[in-house]
Amino acid sequence: MKDTIRQLIQQALTQLVNEGVLPEGLTPAIQVENARDKTHGDFASNIAMMLAKPAGMKPRDLAEKIIAALPADENVTKAEIAGPGFINFFQNTQALASRLDAALADAHVGVRKAGPAQRTVVDLSAPNLAKEMHVGHLRSTIIGDGVARVLEFLGDTVIRQNHVGDWGTQFGMLMAYLQENPITSDELSDLENFYRAAKQRFDESPEFADRARGLVVKLQAGDAECLALWTKFKDISLSHCQKIYELLNVKLTMADVMGESAYNDDLINVVNDLKAAGMLVESNGAQCVFLDEFKNAEGEPLPVIIVKADGGYLYATTDLAAVRYRSGKLKADRALYFVDQRQALHFQQVFAVARKAGFVTHPMEMEHMGFGTMNGADGRPFKTRDGGTVKLIDLLTEAQERAYALVKEKNPTLADDELRSIAKVVGIGAVKYADLSKHRTSDYSFNFDQMLNLEGNTAPYLLYAYTRVAGVFRKLEKEYSEVDGQIVLEAPQEHDLAAKLAQFGEVLNNVAEKGTPHTLCTYLYEVAGLFSSFYEKCPILTAETPAQMQSRLRLAALTGRTLKQGLELLGLETLERM
């Protein structure tokens, strides 16, 4: 609907230019927002205030001329001036109802992508292997997954890339420790304790540390025995990750793994190509790139280190190889990097070097989708009581146990297997939603009591809201698709719910553009609240007429489909009853 209004305004502006009211050459970004006060319209634009100065007119006077020049459209009943020069638009209620009827009949709930479909790389999760995933890996994994799901739903070809840290010193440590302490495969499956013991030896023994580094050199040189051990450690570690992904209901598989090791053979080519481009400069024995746009507080250029003084490569080298692969081989139009926002400078530099070096051969937009940190209830980094890192599996297990206690208290007569099944959906959903509902760039404090609350913007509230809709259709023994009739909007609660449901496509396109799933969370919470008001004020099964009942059932069906689809795009499972 906003696009329709923008087009109407653009046509009016073109007419005013032709009439000499507006000067030629104006290219304003026409903004249309949802009106806050529905008594003054459904949408509002500040275009008259934006163009008043170049037009040499008062905003309200220009607004009058814009309204007079607006073409007639069946979707808009009228336009009015408000305040200092806002133009408020009232949408045609019947046209709105017809759009919702069409959305209910559509497999994509009437949602379409605002622009052309693209090939989009989503770089997400990317844990360092050789140890278990911890809470610090949660945000990249689930925010990236949510945005990837939305992009796919809108029609993009999404290529997930799990850029795991599967190369480096940690594997030398493990190999050196295994040489000292041969163990069985079963014992090795407890990788966390094995890694902890190896790290302790590495920190305490210089001789052990030297041996570990020597094994890394042998590994990088292709030593068969080292490669075999590395493969074993890597496979065990990836299997741990895969269990977490499946528990989190995240769409990542082994086929999506493209770790640091995958780019090893291209690193020397990256160095040689930068050298050939005249971009490499030696600084303190290291090979670096200096770019004028990146300087320190003293105004000196900051180095992007490509090769260390000891000949080793860094993250920047591998990331440059990855950029070239994603552009040249994958032919991506867009690459989204879901990595901690503390890496912002790193990615700014990598992207700039890649463009200058000509590594982006296929036009590819690169965006660092940085995010804040998850903290404990005290606002400090989330740790165990003894100050250690919290393992992700432990956090998710506790979430399920807490949800189980909550569900059992509310439903003491349910069978235990059903309680466990519901608790898994509620517990995992609560952890994910608590994260996804926060702005991506914000830090937030992890709080089990808040996220498992049945009131407020939480997963349990939304899951329960969906079961209320599902319950209506369960009573009727009908599917959402089996409701005949047409939507007719009479009561204010019907109109408010309908107007919100019509915004689903706009919200999803916003998530796809900005990588901000919290806007989808807010939208679903608002839909649930409006459905609650509608459900209380507009009886469905005891409606006054059969036609009214069918209309309200259709509104409920579209609400159910929207909530279910929205939660699925966030990676949350739904329940038919709680």
UniProtKB/Swiss-Prot annotation:
UniProt keyword annotations, A-Z: Aminoacyl-tRNA synthetase, ATP-binding, Cytoplasm, Ligase, Nucleotide-binding, Protein biosynthesis
Motif 'HIGH' region, residue numbers: 127-137
EC top class, as a word: ligase
Disulfide bonds, paired cysteine numbers: none
Reactions listed under catalytic activity: tRNA(Arg) + L-arginine + ATP = L-arginyl-tRNA(Arg) + AMP + diphosphate
Entry EC no(s): 6.1.1.19
GO term, biological process aspect, one: arginyl-tRNA aminoacylation
Subcellular location: Cytoplasm
Signal peptide: none
Major place of residence: cytoplasm
Family matches, as InterPro entries: aa-tRNA-synth_I_CS (IPR001412), Arg-tRNA-ligase (IPR001278), Arg-tRNA-synth_N (IPR005148), Arg-tRNA-synth_N_sf (IPR036695), ArgRS_core (IPR035684), DALR_anticod-bd (IPR008909), Rossmann-like_a/b/a_fold (IPR014729), tRNAsynth_Ia_anticodon-bd (IPR009080)
CDD domains reported for this sequence: ArgRS_core (cd00671)
Family of the protein in this entry: Belongs to the class-I aminoacyl-tRNA synthetase family.
Assembly: Monomer.
One GO CC term, this protein: cytoplasm
Gene Ontology MF annotations: arginine-tRNA ligase activity; ATP binding
Pfam family, one: tRNA-synt_1d
Protein name stated in the entry: Arginine--tRNA ligase
SUPFAM superfamilies: Anticodon-binding domain of a subclass of class I aminoacyl-tRNA synthetases, Arginyl-tRNA synthetase (ArgRS), N-terminal 'additional' domain, Nucleotidylyl transferase
